[in-house]
Amino acid sequence: VDTRLLRTFTTLARTGGFTSAAAELHLAQSTVTVHIRTLEKELGTRLFDRLPTGTLLTESGRRLLEGAEEVLDAVARLRAGGREGDGAVRG
């Protein structure tokens, strides 16, 4: 799963709306929609209930949110660790 899709997913879950998620991510609203549809297709499940007032996580969405946040935190730690190192590749 593409981490960009996970970032869009977690932002939408937190903000509750496609417009606010798009603004926070500096993306077009249509891009947020495509990211969520792509993620739902890849996972084979609906992640949000779309309501007139915003979005609500489904049970599948709630389960994914926990794992997605962990993955994104791990990626951030790896990136931070890479910047702190001396740039040498060891093996």
Question: Can you describe what each PLM-predicted range is?
Answer:
Residues L12-H26:
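Short helix-boundary/capping micro-motifs
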Residues D2-T8, Q29, G61, A68:
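The N-cap/first-turn positions of alpha helices
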Residues A23-E24, K41, R62:
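Alpha-helical residues within the helix-turn-helix
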